[in-house]
């Protein structure tokens, strides 16, 4: 299979140029002007369009069982939506397994979920839900098998205490793995939530009030210090929602500590006023949506380089699930938002087209840095000879309004309903194969490959 993309503006994190791009057998073979292939190939005219590396979304939750519900996107519908949104690689955060289970148990479960279903290439983050000698001994073996990042939780059912966190940080660091963490102060949240429930205050607004930004920021500061105590272990903060936490991360960076951070479109573009609407239960996620001032602080981090990655935390529960389970009580509502199909378009429209970020910075946030941090570079996140032929073509001249009826996930709503975006995704190619074309999904279930990731090597801070 040969594909020649002509006349587009090819963009990598380190520059852009109007040039052609030739893909053969799923691999980028040549970039240059006026490429004339020796053999017949499919030609795509990308005149007036940007040609970007396919998106790498390092934070999804497909087919996750949270105890009270299972998310409604599996590895087919979830990766189909990703493909239609210009994302060609996902790294899914595995959910909790049975009490006391080994790390390998969850890996085998999740490989079963994805096999024969995933449309695009995929990998997983391990999850450490308890600490004992067997788990610690298992970590190096998992890294050898291609899982080079693991998630810790400071809240929810399988939260770790500080001693357990230190043990995990040390062993992960020694084993060549990156520690990722969901940082919220569980005790403070439980106290606030109990107060509201006792007072009968269970509307969606109280979800946000029960998880104030200080709960998140305190946990970020604590993890930064614990990582330092654990021998300067590398640390990756997921789904940052506030400026105070970002300030702590800036300080750690100034002290040459290896820390990185992601945020998500919902924290850049949605705010806490959504909880006061008739459909407020649609927006229950943790950490919750913040105010516009926090959005502005995050945009500063996007613009000046303090934020490294934009991912989605895609975790879809339908409105029907939310209403049936919660019965109007925020504390009983499953948490999470859909968004894997909208990430690239939303950031391009609100970032590149507004002048907040350059096209190169867009690549850094959506594909290059995710690939570098999580052991996929230069196979992913780069358009250069030898890299995978993963491409998204965006036409900046087109304007689109997001409507859920045109999306490809398995939810029954979109938090982005009615958003108007400048710039449209017109083609997605995965290893040279067209999987999305002018509004139509053209991929197939099971073509995605499991990616064995390299051990963690820190990018230059």
From Swiss-Prot:
This is D-phenylhydantoinase. Catalyzes the stereospecific hydrolysis of the cyclic amide bond of D-hydantoin derivatives with an aromatic side chains at the 5'-position. Has no activity on dihydropyrimidines. The physiological function is unknown. A divalent metal cation 2 binds at residues 151, 182, 239. It is an enzyme of class 3 (hydrolase). Binds 2 divalent metal cations per subunit. Carboxylation allows a single lysine to coordinate two divalent metal cations. GO terms for molecular function: hydrolase activity, acting on carbon-nitrogen (but not peptide) bonds, in cyclic amides; metal ion binding. One of its GO terms (biological process) is pyrimidine nucleobase catabolic process. Coiled coil: none annotated. InterPro entries: Amidohydro-rel, D_phenylhydantoinase, Hydantoinase/dihydroPyrase, Metal-dep_hydrolase_composite, Metal_Hydrolase, Metallo-dep_Hydrolases_sf. GO terms for cellular component: cytosol. The keyword Metal-binding applies. Pfam families: Amidohydro_1. Its cofactor is a divalent metal cation. Signal peptide: none annotated. Belongs to the metallo-dependent hydrolases superfamily. Hydantoinase/dihydropyrimidinase family. It comes from Escherichia coli O127:H6 (strain E2348/69 / EPEC). The modification N6-carboxylysine is found at residue 151. Its EC number is 3.5.2.-.
